[in-house]
Amino acid sequence: TENLNVLDYDIYFSATDLILENNIPELLILFNKTLSLGFDGHHFITGLASHFRDLMVCQHPDTLNLLEVGEDVTKQYQDQSKKASKQFLLKAIDLANECDLQYKTSKNQRLLVELTLMKLASITFDGEKKKLIS
């Protein structure tokens, strides 16, 4: 996939697992590895936004046909979509889309994506903290 300049589905499945685990250090390492393969941050974050969209599509049988991937990958999407709430996915799509919109005008694009990744990995963590406090 490196030659085609197309990021593999596995990168996004891995990134999403790390986000759901609130694992910011490993997520930043994965992003750095992706950059070192020659991909840019914009490509990474827009792909991640699409991945979140596809996970949301998997959560309802009526929208499953909107997923344009093979059977094996569809199964992976369905499995991962069970781990992510609709609220999480909406927030994640919103954050990734916001990063996409700001990317071209950002003076520090890498930091913008890294900050977005940290925010993404904190979505469910914040919820846990709120539960502990109340």
Label the model's feature ranges.
Residues 1-133:
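Extended, largely alpha-helical regulatory/partner-binding modules appended to the mid-to-C-terminal parts
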